[in-house]
């Protein structure tokens, strides 16, 4: 892919070691002076687009590191899996199969009533897993067919979005969900899903949740802001006049939300339920990273 490389994944560190994931080239651990501690060959991880396997986009999911455990989400053409490794030795602790095509999201670690969970995005297989064993806790089908954004947790809800193909959903999932929580046709909520929106999902950007609002920006620059608890739409506004794509995820701090377009324009908005631009800054170069 023209926007990809052989090093799409972000490094993970716990202050003692660096974990790097290079898809088919393997999983690596280094100390902070660059000494190789261990490496794992995970085989061929074919992350080509499922409708055109010859389109080699490379893997994009980043490793996560928690409590001396490294977790990898490897959704590929054949044999998709989620796996955990001992960060000190590289020993595989568990591996579970996933019924999904290539996806590019990174898992999130979350504590629910004393249980550590892994939450993953997907198309056919969005879900949560027990961090210690890999046992599935809940699952959900019905994402966009090229999932990229990372799940975000806020105030008892897990926000998952994706966009591409016929669906572009936003889900607010209760952290206590169990079992199959896939929505029935025409439904927007159930016992596991607090609320959802069918067509406002983000393609590339992970949405921040800030001061009770969810900020979801589409690839074409349309920003949708939701009440995190109720799903009420506060406003929708197009940024960049529709002339630039958005790949970089928004960030929020100090009462402001920062959104960077691919053409290098950074939009600074006042955080809140109404649209107000505080500043625009030109980086004079393309911006795709967060």
Label the model's feature ranges.
Residues 1-290:
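Noncatalytic, solvent-exposed loop/strand surfaces
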């Amino acid at each position: 892919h023209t926007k990809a490389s052989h090093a799409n994944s972000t490094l993970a560190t716990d202050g003692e070691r660096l974990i790097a994931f290079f898809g088919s080239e393997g999983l690596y651990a280094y100390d902070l002076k660059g000494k190789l501690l261990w490496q794992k060959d995970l085989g061929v991880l074919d992350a080509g687009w499922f409708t055109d396997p010859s389109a080699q986009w490379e893997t994009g999911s980043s490793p996560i590191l928690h409590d001396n455990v490294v977790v990898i989400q490897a959704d590929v053409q054949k044999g998709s899996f989620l796996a955990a490794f001992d960060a000190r030795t590289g020993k595989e602790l568990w591996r579970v199969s996933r019924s999904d095509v290539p996806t590019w999201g990174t898992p999130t670690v979350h504590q629910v009533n004393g249980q550590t969970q892994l939450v993953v995005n997907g198309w056919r297989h969005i879900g949560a897993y027990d961090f210690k064993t890999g046992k599935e806790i809940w699952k959900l089908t019905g994402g966009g067919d090229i999932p990229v954004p990372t799940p975000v947790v806020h105030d008892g809800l897990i926000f998952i979005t994706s966009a591409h193909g016929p669906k572009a959903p936003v889900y607010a999932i209760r952290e206590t969900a169990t079992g199959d929580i896939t929505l029935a046709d025409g439904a927007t909520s159930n016992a596991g899903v607090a609320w959802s929106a069918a067509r406002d999902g983000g393609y590339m950007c992970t949405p921040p949740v800030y001061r009770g609002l969810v900020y979801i920006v589409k690839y074409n620059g349309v920003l949708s802001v939701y009440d995190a608890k109720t799903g009420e739409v506060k406003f929708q506004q197009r940024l960049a006049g529709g002339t630039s794509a958005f790949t970089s995820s928004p960030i929020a701090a100090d009462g402001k939300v920062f959104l960077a377009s691919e053409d290098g324009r950074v939009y600074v908005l006042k955080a809140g339920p109404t649209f107000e631009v505080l500043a625009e800054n030109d980086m004079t170069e393309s911006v795709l990273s967060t």
